[in-house]
Amino acid sequence: MSTDAAHSLADAYGLSGAGSDPVEVEPGLWVQQVDTQRELERSWSEVSGYLRAVLDAAGVDHLTAEELTVVPGLEEVLALLELRAHVRQQHRSGGGPWDVVVVDCAPTAETLRLLALPEALRWYLDRVGGPERRLLKALRPVVGRATGLPVPGDEVISAVERLQADLLEVRRLLVRPESSVRLVLTPERVVLAEARRSLTTLSLLGYRVDGVVANRVFPAGAGAWADGWQAAQAEVLAEVHDSFAPLPVWTSSYAAAEPVGPDAVASVAQDAYASRGTEDPFAVPEGPGPVRVRRLGATGPGERRGAELRVSLPFVATGDVDLARHGESLVVTVGAYRRVLTLPASLARWPVSGATVDDGVLRVRFREAAAAAAAEDDVPEQGEEQPW
């Protein structure tokens, strides 16, 4: 399934007039071009209506207000709700029609930020719910008269809460051990730098990356014109292997013609995955996820036990990370990206005793608080790691 508004997936398979429902192009292969506008209207209509009212009151013309009420990249994230629908269908039917679902979703800067939206919304809504929401309701007439701007009603806040619940469910789906992200790049230095940043950000957000596909690689013997490109690509490909080790790196050669149609697309896939002798490109990735917790024993007489939260942050040094403790949450900031980690109940009671970054892994150490020394908790046994 593709979330690309330009319908590039439908074009690649030579489908004309493909609708928003899955279309079978080969036995066992279905293609879907997601109707992002439909999801946008369903999930964002109340909120966009309120934002239009605010902008209208501020004197913004109608057409400009219509554009400003759509968050850049939101359509792509909302399209992932269609993925959730497919998984629900799978569970309801006790197996369902799909063995695997592949989502063509470009990891742009906006999309990476919006993948953090569910947790950010939860942090915000936790602070406008309960007494704060009742206070807002009581003060709504006063605030409206004082500012001259519309104040969000219950239906707007409820719509945001529904969207947050939907996106949290999508997030839980995407961070399962069976789910993973596969990066696609071309062997160019600028593209490689962006792919490295994408790996760091995806790991920070808790998404597992299972490998890298290097696309449009000039094959040997392509001719004198391509010799310069081939030499330059060979240098970058060596950096790709070094940068992403131990992740597998597949290479796909530059095709003689644009691959359009099921046969041409299948040929590209066979070329890429044969480059490493991969038998099952859809195999569930092994090994720990990007975020996990490990129990630590007492370090000496009179010391309390502890735990270590580990977050994979490739290409990051200690000075690149900012940490802040906020109640039961740990706020991790790397460059322009921030993640609010809601700590397990056990760790939420324990103070942070230190943090370092070693070999691309952020290690945040907690020491048991005196009041919790005898309490039951959900920290794993000593030396054992468990996923976040």
Give the location of each predicted region.
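Primarily hydrophobic membrane-targeting regions of prokaryotic envelope proteins
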Residues: M1-T3, L83, A195, T200, ...
